[in-house]
Amino acid sequence: MVRWLFLLVAMLLSGCANLGCWPNCAAHTRNSSSLVEFLYPHGEAPPVQNSIPQLKIPLRVGLAFLPSSESSATGGLDAAHQEVLLERIRQRFSSRPFVAEIVMIPDYYLRGRGGYEGLQGVQRLYGVDIMALVSYDQVVHTDENNWSLGYLTIVGAYVLKGSRHDVSTLVDLAVVDPVTHSLLLRAGGTSTSHGNTTLISENREIRGAAAQGYDAATNEMIEHFDTALTKFEADVRSGKAPVQVVHKNDTVRSGSGGGGALNWPLVLMLLAAVGIRRLERMA
């Protein structure tokens, strides 16, 4: 009898707690990193682009997550998970013929290095030609049922209350040239999920849903970036891309402007032919 009285009191107290927060029994947490805030930390407007980026292929590409500006215990993207996602991106694009190597860079190398000037320091440190920066934004909404007293379940000594969570995730990949302060290419992916849990396992299940959100959004971003990269390659070949491509051991191809690039092997052959002809005349 005493045991059942104890459980009844616990249920009533739990119900009163729920009714006490009605109708505002909801909360949200946010985890994010911002490309705009990183590149322009003082809120300045992006300048007008006056110079054409020069891409020296095959490229060494630096790949990194931008440091988080907001974080929480239930949905943060930890270093181990970042490495898994970066490796997934690296494997997808490292086989491209114009890529020599994709170098994964831990996000702590970018902390305190906001702006293009700081990015150039990382570029020199790792000896890369361009930087591929991954940013993200994830919001987790949790909401206890306003009438959760009717959904109480007694298991042993526990009184369980129902809770619902919604997880919205965006992952974005932007390729920038730190030297000319140019955005070369970008693509993003999103993910949205919903779930129900109990307050006892709420944090664990929300962390799992948050991790799945990063995975799903990254997978979609990779597909979108692959499409955008294929189009970018076609624009370079047709001269529509606002870049100048320099083959490190060969010629120059210009996307917009740049004009008459020299084919140096052909020039050397012509000079050699002229020299031989002069020697023949002297003989």
Question: Where in this protein do the model-derived segments appear?
Answer:
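Surface-exposed short loop/turn segments
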Residues: 113-179
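A generic local structural motif
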Residues: 48-50, 117-119, 276
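N-terminal secretory signal peptides that target proteins for export/translocation
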Residues: 1-2, 283
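Structural motif
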Residues: 8-11, 53, 94, 123
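C-terminal/domain-edge helix-coil "capping" segments
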Residues: 17-56, 161-170, 176-188, 192-263
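N-terminal segment of the mature soluble domain
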Residues: 57-141
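Bacterial N-terminal signal peptides
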Residues: 4-15, 269-273
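A cross-kingdom C-terminal cell-surface attachment/processing module
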Residues: 263-282
